[in-house]
Amino acid sequence: MVNCVVKNWQGDEVGQTSLELKVAKEETASHILHRAVVRHLANARQGNASTKTRAEVRGGGRKPWRQKGTGRARAGSNRSPLWRGGGVIFGPKPRDYSQKMNRKERRLALRTALNSKAENLIIVENFAPELPQPKTKELALALTRWGVTEKDKVLLILSEIPENISLSARNICNVKLIRADSINVYDILSASKLVATSDALAKILEVYSD
């Protein structure tokens, strides 16, 4: 169990909360996290790269020159893979790159990733009322008060994403917004700081804690 300090909009400590998650064993943690990251990246691939074989390329039906007597290398088609404009040998075709992972493993990987970032997890009160209108500067200053530096890559986790917060955060470098029910291992591990609202943390614990 990890105890986390809760901060308000001004950056003052207003309470504490605990992060209690069942995580993978130390000897298997890196393996299950690796599988989850590879799965996430593989599932994001479109897999629509496509090339044409010599059978699919337009043209090439006529023999370029006769078999013998010209002194040139024999050729049966000007769409051979050896020719410019010819087909591609063993080129990519549309395919599905998606990988499967058991639900229990996915949840365990996510809990393990969250727990590994506990030292860099910042819990804040719901700050939507503090931004009635989109204000990028105000949100950037709040992140600084919460202990985030310009070099940090931040994952901002909210239970819901109001439009005013979305518009305020979209022009801040290295800040990514995500809903609590959409978090994934890749985004958690790639961030140097996690900033989550109390509501978002409660939702995460409700959904993912075993």
From Swiss-Prot:
Biased composition (Basic residues): 60-71
Keyword entries, A-Z: Ribonucleoprotein, Ribosomal protein, RNA-binding, rRNA-binding
Job description of the protein: One of the primary rRNA binding proteins, this protein initially binds near the 5'-end of the 23S rRNA. It is important during the early stages of 50S assembly. It makes multiple contacts with different domains of the 23S rRNA in the assembled 50S subunit and ribosome. Forms part of the polypeptide exit tunnel.
Region annotation (Disordered) ranges: 46-96
Gene Ontology molecular-function annotations: rRNA binding; structural constituent of ribosome
Protein name per Swiss-Prot or TrEMBL: Large ribosomal subunit protein uL4
Disulfide bonds, paired cysteine numbers: none
Gene3D superfamilies listed in its UniProt record: 3.40.1370.10
Assembly with partners or alone: Part of the 50S ribosomal subunit.
Species this chain originates from: Gloeothece citriformis (strain PCC 7424) (Cyanothece sp. (strain PCC 7424))
Gene for this chain: rplD
Superkingdom of this protein's organism: Bacteria
BP terms from Gene Ontology: translation
GO cellular component, one term: ribosome
UniProt-listed InterPro entries: Ribosomal_uL4, Ribosomal_uL4-like, Ribosomal_uL4_dom_sf
Family: Belongs to the universal ribosomal protein uL4 family.
